Amino acid sequence: MTNPYSNYFFKKFFICLNSNDRIYLLKKIENSIIKLSLDEIGTYPIQTIIEYLNNKIEKMIVISAIKDHIPELIYNQYGSYVVEKLISCVDEKDIPFLYSFIANNFIQLAFNNNAICVIKKLLALNLNKYMHDIIKNIVIKHAKEFILHPCGNFVIQAIVEFWVDYLDIIFLYKNNFFNLSLEKYASNVIERFIEKDERILMEYIDEIIASGKIYEIMKSKFGNYVIQKAIKLSKNAYKNKLVFNAAIMINNLKDNKLIIKWKSILMPHINELPEDSIAKLNFRNFFNI
């Protein structure tokens, strides 16, 4: 099961076995399930086994072997994928110990390079209200830490993608869209916000314009992607308003490369503005066009 080639055979072999033979085989490898789960190759057949468990006895053997080793698995590069498969393929009622561990250690897991894949998978599920509320309350309490963290920001992105009440989380960051757009990891989350909901896109545009420093986002290593996305997604009056304000700020960029870059970005949209628009006149005068 740890051979790069024979592990493929084992996966196919297990799928083809009848239930009695599966149970016999699982009992034979029961004491090696954890070791295999932590192995670069062995993790794959264990994931296949979990995916194709089809009766109570099979589940009981595997769950019994794994139950006391969740921390060891979930923080491991390979074991975390076994836990992810458990969450995807086994009913919550059969693995309450796993959900309890996640609830009690959510922040540590969300901020871990390996465990975050498990958390993302969990957030995509239709969680019961108890688990949903536990996670939601943790995120509300530590909202800033999550959005700025290299792993934790994926929690916010997953909530926005999969949860019905995603706006409750987005509104935690309202009035901070400008500053968050300048941050390496948070800027990705802000992009997700404005992609998800047109109301948030409009809030974002209003906020960055009100700041009077839209040029800071335009020249930001991270923020420039957010405002480009906003220009692409916005419509009608909001697009015109955003393009107008970006155009009149272009001379604040100073750097010639940035100015040329933003000229090419804004040009197609500038042409859509009214002929007597101050932004259009400023833009044309600045570039002598």
Roles of regions detected by a PLM:
Residues M1-I289:
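Eukaryotic gene-expression regulator signature that favors modular helical reader/repeat domains
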